[in-house]
Amino acid sequence: MADLSLADALTEPSPEIEEEIKRDFIATLEAEAFDDVVGETVGKTDYIPLLDVDEKTGSSESKKKPCSDTSQVEGTPSSQAAVLANGDHGIERNDVTGFPSEFLEEKMAYQGYQNSQNWPENTNFCFEPEHMVNPIQTDPFKMHHDDGLEDSLFFPSGTTNTSVFVEQNDPLKDTYGMLPCDTFAPAAVVPQGWSAEAPNLAHLESFTSPEAVPQPLQPTAEPAEKVEMASGEERAEALEMMMKLQAADMAPSREAEMVLAKDVVPATETGVALAKDMESPTKPDEALVKDVESSIESDMALVKDVVLPVQTEETAVKDAILPTETDVSLDEDLALSTETEVSTAQDILLFKETESIPPVTMDLASAEGTVPPTDQEMTPVKVAASLSEIEAPLDEDIVSSTEIRSAKEIGLSSETEVALSREMGLPPETEAILDKDMAAPPETEVIVPVKDMAPSPGIETTLAKDVAPRQEIEVTLGKDTVSLPATEMALGRNVALPPETEVTLAKDVAQPPETEVNLANNAALAKFSEAEVVPVPVKDMETAQTQEATSEDSQLKSLQDEGQSAVPLMTSPEAVVAMGQKHSLPTDEDSVLEELEQKKPSSQTSELPSETSGVAKPEEGPPTGSVSGNDITAPPNKELPPSPEKKTKPLATTQPAKTSTSKAKTQPTSLPKQTAPTTLGGSNKKPMSLASGSVPAAPPKRPAAATSRPSTLPSKDTKPKPVAEAKIPEKRVSPSKPASAPAVKPGSKSTQAVPKAPATATLASPGSTSRNLSTPLPKRPTAIKTEGKPAEIKKMATKSAPADLSRPKSTTTSSVKKSTTVPGTAPPAGAPSRARPTATPPRPSGTPPVDKKPTAAKPTSSAPRLGRVAANASAPDLKNVRSKVGSTENIKHQPGGGRAKVEKKTEAAAPARKPEPNAVTKAAGPIGNAQKPPTGKVQIQNKKVDISKVSSKCGSKANIKHKPGGGDVKIESQKLNFKEKAQAKVGSLDNVGHLPAGGAVKTEGGGSEAPPCPGPPAGEELAIPEAAPEAGAPASASGLSGHTTLAGGGDQREAQTLDSQIQETSKWLGLA
C-alpha cells in the first residue's frame, strides 16, 4: 500500500482516501455509536474482506468495523487484513506522518492481529493513523486519537511522536509485554534516547532492530521454554501469537519480525490460535493465556530485549524466572483455571509485559529495579500465597466471569496490548511525560520493571493476584505511583475509570476490547507511562515505598485478595488501590485524594463530569454497547455481554466495588478488565474506590447511561478520553496532570485517556452521571474540544488552571510540557496529594474529598501552572526577545536616521560638486560610510537614496555624458569652424575657391598652371589620397594642389585650399 498510497494518492486512492476519510468520520461516528457492535460478527466476517478488499478503505471500514469486529481481533485474517490495512494505513501514515504512521503501521499492523478488537478504537487509531496520512482523516483521528497521536505524531512531529510512541510504548510496554517489544525496542532505543524520535524510528527499527530481534529470540526462546513449561504447543502457539501479537504490538518489526519471522509460521499458528481464539472464547482464553503467557514470555523476551541493553537480561532473567514462576503459577493457574490463568496470565502478561517494562529497570535501577522486584517478587510470592488462595476463588470468579472476561480481557489484553501499543501512540502525553521521564523513565521503567518484575511473580503466581501483582506492579508502580499517586491517580482514574472504563471498556472492549484492555492497559500504561513518568521523582520514594509498599502491597494484596477472593481481580484492584494507597501511603491518600478529588470533581467536576462522566459514561455507556459489541464482536468475549454489563455495573460498581461492596460483583465481572485497570489504577483506582464510595449509586447510573449509549459512547469514549483526560487532570489535579499529560495527550491515546476519562467520569459522574449521560454524547464529538471545555469548565472551578494547563500542555506541548509538568508537577501533586492523603485517607466521599480535591487541584494546578507558566514565561521571554527583535527593527530604523545623516553628508558632498569626481567620491564615500554602518535594509535604502542624490550632485555626470557627445559635436564644429576660420584667415579662400574654379586667376599667376586646371584627372588621382589632407598637401606642393582642390571635396578642399593658398603664396613668392 505504500506504493499504492503514493500511486493511489495520485490516482484512485484519492477517492478511496476520501472514502476513508468519510469512513473514518463514519467510523468515528460508528465507533462512537458502536452500533456496529451488534454487527461485529458481520464486521468480523466482513472485516477481513474489508481489509482485504478495501485495504485502505476496507481497512478504514474494517478498522471502523473492528469496533464491531472486536471479535475480529482474534481473527487472524482480519487482523492480518488489518495488518495489511494497517500496513497500508501505516504506509499511508508513513507517507503523511512518516514515522508515526510507520510506527503505528507496524504496531497496528501487528496489533491488528490481536487488535482487531482493539480496532474499534484503534479503528480511530489504526485507520486514523492512516488518517494521519489524510489530515482530514486525522481530524477524526485527532478527535480521539489525535490528542496523543497528533501531539505524538504532529506535536512531536515525530519526536514526540516517537517519544510518545516510544514512551507510550513504554506505557504499553508497561502495560504490555507486547508493546514492551515495541516499547522495549523503544525502551532499548528510547531509554537510550527517550525523546529520540530516531529512537522511535529506532524503536520502529527496534521493532526490527537486530537488538530487539536477537533479543526477542532469547526472550522468545525463554518464552518458548516457558511456553513449553506451561504448555509447549499452546503457549508456543499463544507465544507465537503473543510474540507475534507482541511482536506485532510491541516490536511489530522487532519481535514481530523476529517472532513473526519465527512466528511467521506461528503467525499462521497465531492465525490458527487467533482463529481458535475466535472459535472458542475458552480456547482464546487459553490461547490468550498462552498468548499472555507468551506475551509475558514475549514481554520477558521483550523486556529482555528492551532491558537487554542494561538489565533487561537480568530483569528479563528475573522476568524469565518470574515467567517461569508464572509458568509454574500459570501451570498451577492453568490447572486451577486456564482461563483464570488466562486472565491472570493476561493480566500478568500485561503487567508482566509491563514487567517487560523492566527496560526501565534496564535504564534507571537495573539493580534497583531488580532488587525492588525481588522485594516485590517476594511480595508477589506472598501475594501468590494469598492470591493462590484468591486464585481458587479467582479461578471460580475468573473462570466464571474472568473466563468470560479472560477471553475478553485476554482479547483485550492482546488487543489492549495492541491498543496499548496504539495507546502508546495515544499516550503522547504519557509519552511526553515519559519523554519528560525519559530521563526519569529509567527509574520509572526500572520501577516499572521492578513493579513488573515483582508483580510478575505475584502476577504470575496469581492472576487474580495479577491484579494484586498488578497492584504490586501498581505498588511498584504504586511506588512509582508514590509519584504516580498523581500518575496512578491519573492512571488511577484511568484505572479507576478503567474498572468502569474497563468495565466500560469491557463494554468498549466489546466494542474495542482493545479499548478496555487499552484502557486497562492504558490505565496501566497511563499508569506506567505516568508511573514511568512521574515515578522518576517518585522512584526515590518509590524504592523505599516500593519495598514498604511491596510488603504492604503483599499484605494488602493478600488481605484484599484473600478478603476479596470471591472478587479476586476487583480485590486486586482494591488491593491495588489499597496497595497503591498503601504502598504509596501518599498514593493511598493520593488515591483517596484522587477519589475525593475525583469525587469532588464528581460534585465539582460534575459539570465537567457531565462532560467527563459524559465522556466517561460514554465510555461506560459505550462499554455497555462495547460489551455487546465485544460480546458480539469477540466470540470469546461474547460471554462478556453479562460481563460487560457486570463490568458496566461493576464498573460503576467497581468504584463501589473498590469500596468493597461491589467488589465481589465487579471483580468477577470487571475483574479481568479491572484487573488491568485496577491493577493499573489500583492505587489510582482508589479514587474510583473512593469515588465509587460516593458513586456507588451513580456508577449504576453510569452503566444505565452507558447502557443507553453503549454504541455511541464507545467512539466517544475514545474521543472523550481527551476530555476525560483533561478532566482526569482535573480530578487528579497533580496526578491528573500526569494523567492529563498522558490522558490529555491521549487524544490519540484516547484509549488510555478513556480509561482515565471513564475513571474520572466515573468518579466525577457519580454526581453527574445523569448529566454526563446527556453531556457525553456532545462531548465525545467535542471530546477534543470538550477536553478543552470540560477540563476548562471543571478546572475553571477548582482546576481551571490545571485543566487549562493540562489542556494547553496537551494541546500545545501536551507531550513535552505535560511530561515536563507531569514529572515536575506530578511530584508536587504527589506531594500535595500525599500531604492531602492525611486529610483524605478517610474515604468520606462527602465534602472532604471535594475539599481535598480542590486543594489538590489548586496546588497541583498551581504547580502545573507554575510549570506551565514557567514554560509560558519562557515563551513570553522568547516573545519578548522577539519584541527585542522588534527593537532590532527599531535599530534598523535608526539606520534610517543614519540615512538622514547620509543625506547630510551627501549635501556636504554636494557643495563639493565643483570637483565633480570629488563630489561624487565624497558623496559616495559618505554614502558608503553611512551605508556601511547601517548594514541592512537601511544601507540599501541609503544607497538608493544616495545614488539618487549622487546623481543629482553628479548632475555633472549628465553633463559629462553630454560632454562626450557635445565634445564630439564641438570638435566637429571646431573642425568646421577651424577650417572656416583658417580659410577666413587665409582670406585667399575666395581665391582658393576661385583658383579651382577659375584657372584664369592662376593663369594670371602663371599660364602654365592654367593648363593644370584640367587637372581633374590628376585631382581624381589626388582624390584618392583625399582622405589624407597631408597627401593633398604634398600634391599641392607638387603644384597639383589646385587640381587636387578641384578634385578634392569638402574638408580636403579646405585643407587643400589652404595648401593651395600656400602654394599660391609660394608661387607668388616664387613669381616675386
Swiss-Prot record:
The keyword Phosphoprotein applies. It is found in: Cytoplasm, Cytoskeleton; Cytoplasm, Cytoskeleton, Microtubule organizing center. Non-neuronal microtubule-associated protein. Promotes microtubule assembly. The modification Phosphothreonine is found at residues 282, 354, 416, 501, 888. It comes from the Eukaryota. Residues 54-67, 716-733, 786-795 have a biased composition (Basic and acidic residues). The modification Phosphoserine is found at residues 5, 14, 60, 253, 280, 386, 414, 529, 572, 584, 591, 643, 660, 670, 734, 774, 800, 874, 887, 988, 1060, 1066. Is distributed ubiquitously among all tissues but amounts are lower in cerebellum and liver. The modification N-acetylalanine is found at residue 2. Residues 244-530 are annotated as: 19 X 14 AA tandem repeats. It comes from Bos taurus (Bovine). Residues 735-750, 809-824, 1018-1042 have a biased composition (Low complexity). Tau/MAP repeats lie at residues 869-899, 938-968, 969-1000. Its main location: cytoplasm. One of its GO terms (molecular function) is microtubule binding. This is Microtubule-associated protein 4. Phosphorylated at serine residues in K-X-G-S motifs by MAP/microtubule affinity-regulating kinase (MARK1 or MARK2), causing detachment from microtubules, and their disassembly. Phosphorylation on Ser-734 negatively regulates MAP4 activity to promote microtubule assembly. The gene is MAP4.
